[in-house]
Amino acid sequence: MNAHRVPATFVSFDGAVSASGVCQRPDRYRFIDAPDPDLAPRIARGGGYSYAAASFGAGSVVQDMRRFNRILGFDPAARIIEVEAGVTLGDVFAVASREGLGLPVQPGYPAITVGGCIAANVHGKNPVREGTFVDSVLDLTLFHPDRGVLRLSPTPCPDCSI
């Protein structure tokens, strides 16, 4: 699908790496799942705050995930929050802090997306004691172009693991 495709220049957070390409800003899952043979390989992009140029590259179509920014569920008693990839840490902190909760790993920039934190396995100020962001992820749902929708977990599962 050509919906929401625009030419764009992507730059790493520190400005050291840049590339020109196509950005797709889907606002519906069907724009992600739909096969589109004229598209180059696609890569998901969060807030774009990584120092590594992990969310763009020559010849790829970047899918900006920031429109997938819903908090789908929150159970303060179980200390579980379910979110879409484009939710920012600031949004998570705002919801969790109302219940006196927070994340053990808290990177310093609130505009970072949860999907970006998982992809980069970010850490806070004390990764030796608190671990990294992925250590707080129970499971995630991922769309793979050849295998479809996968539910991934750090514990053994039939699909694969994170």
Regions found by a protein language model. Give the residues of each.
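FAD-binding subdomain of flavoenzyme oxidoreductases
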Residues: 117-162
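Short loop/turn segments at beta-alpha junctions that line or gate ligand-sensing/allosteric surfaces
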Residues: 111
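Glycine-rich N-terminal segment of FAD-binding domains in flavoprotein oxidoreductases
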Residues: 11-108, 121-126
